[in-house]
């Protein structure tokens, strides 16, 4: 099975060393809203009383970032891109124990410089 994240170049910079942007396809984006569940909330509450990292939420947000990134890559491929430049994550609290993670960047077609 091919890992979708291996099929496209994703960078936080406006250019990719060794590559030339030949076409801009538009904004690639992918988002997910994750809700906590009772088990995580109880563990988080106990950790909050004690202090320190809330590992249950850290794990949940890491999973959400991976899924948002995967969705952005799928969108970039649908746009006909083989790379995404200026990649970023954005997060927001939706309320009710939910958080949105949004991945976005500029979908482009690149070719190796000669």
UniProtKB/Swiss-Prot annotation:
Instruction: Tell me the Gene3D superfamilies matching this sequence.
Output: Hypothetical protein apc22750. Chain B
The record, for InterPro entries, names: UPF0145_dom_sf (IPR035439), UPF0145_YbjQ-like (IPR002765)
A Pfam family annotated for this UniProt entry = YbjQ_1
Q: Which domain of life is it from?
A: Archaea
Please state the span of the N-terminal signal peptide per the UniProt entry.
none
Disulfide bond positions: none
Sorted alphabetically, which PANTHER family does this protein's record hold? UPF0145 PROTEIN SCO3412 (PTHR34068:SF2), UPF0145 PROTEIN YBJQ (PTHR34068)
Q: Do you know which NCBIfam families this protein is assigned to?
A: PRK03732.1
Q: Which HAMAP family match?
A: UPF0145 (MF_00338)
Q: Which family does it belong to?
A: Belongs to the UPF0145 family.
Name the record gives this protein: UPF0145 protein PF1756
Q: Which organism is it from?
A: Pyrococcus furiosus (strain ATCC 43587 / DSM 3638 / JCM 8422 / Vc1)
């Amino acid at each position: 099975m091919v890992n979708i994240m291996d099929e496209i170049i994703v960078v936080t910079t406006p250019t990719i060393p060794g590559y030339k942007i030949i076409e801009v396809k538009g904004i690639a984006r992918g988002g997910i809203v994750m809700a906590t569940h009772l088990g995580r909330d109880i563990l988080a509450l106990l950790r909050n009383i004690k202090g320190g990292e809330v590992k249950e939420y850290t794990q949940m947000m890491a999973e959400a970032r991976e899924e948002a990134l995967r969705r952005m890559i799928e969108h970039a491929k649908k746009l006909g891109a083989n790379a995404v430049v200026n990649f970023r994550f954005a997060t927001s609290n939706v309320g009710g124990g939910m958080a949105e993670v949004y991945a976005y960047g500029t979908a482009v077609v690149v070719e190796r410089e000669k």
